[in-house]
Amino acid sequence: MKKNLGMLALIMAFWFTISFITNILGPLIPDIIHNFNLSDLAMAGFIPTSFFLAYAIMSIPAGLLIDRFGEKPVLFCGFLMPFIGTILFACMHTYPMLLASSFIIGLGMAMLQTVLNPLQRTVGGEENYAFIAELAQFMFGIASFLSPLAYTYLIRELDPATYTAGKSLILDLLADMTPQDMPWVSLYWVFTLLLLVMLIAVGVSHFPKIELKEDEKSGSKDSYLALFKQKYVWLFFLGIFCYVSTEQGTSIFMSTFLEQYHGVNPQTEGAQAVSYFWGLMT
């Protein structure tokens, strides 16, 4: 494993990026409701729904793409999709575009998670797979903890009432590219830059060929149909659905709940609560 430490570090950076973008929705929901004048929480709920619906759609095709084209092209496309999604909304700040952006980002994230799990086993070695998987989850949690704090920082620094030009070149650029009444959109420019770095990293890196186990290879159409006929497959699906719904539902609407029922400022204490939630989950 020692000779692959650089590659492992890159994979951990991939997981960090995925989580940093994926778990920011909680702090953003109150801003989305206010800026787009959404009448109820159901309208806001379509944002995470579009994101996770993309997972359901892309999971099986992602496996087929890995079998046909290999891990590097799928990894590159996995970062390219959210790059396109984030830059679209960063440039066009409408509710329909946010829905489309979330869906496109979700497609890419599904591709990334499908390819990264077998890749980290190949790079780290079969005997270290459990440790590498736990390390990846740790990086995932750290990014989830930090992203709401990054949101609060940008909101505070880009607030028209407190923003001072010339304080920072990066902040000046973000201020120029972000609507004054929607400073949270600056996060999408940060995501775009982060994803661009990941695309370059994938482009210049040489990844080992993934040797998939027999039970990891994508099967034929008949094999999928046979799986869907098994009741335990549906029970597993239901279990994952309930877990993810509980975890993501809590984090996504926590800040909104605290604002509406307890008068908590969603841009500071609300975002901090989401950060602590992910930190404790880690």
Which ranges hold each PLM region?
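Extracytoplasmic
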Residues: 6-38, 116-117, 147, 151, ...
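Extracellular/periplasmic helix-loop-helix junction of adjacent transmembrane segments
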Residues: 28-56
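Intracellular juxtamembrane helix-capping segments at the cytosolic ends
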Residues: 111-125
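Central cavity-lining transmembrane alpha-helices of secondary-active solute carriers
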Residues: 46-64, 275-282
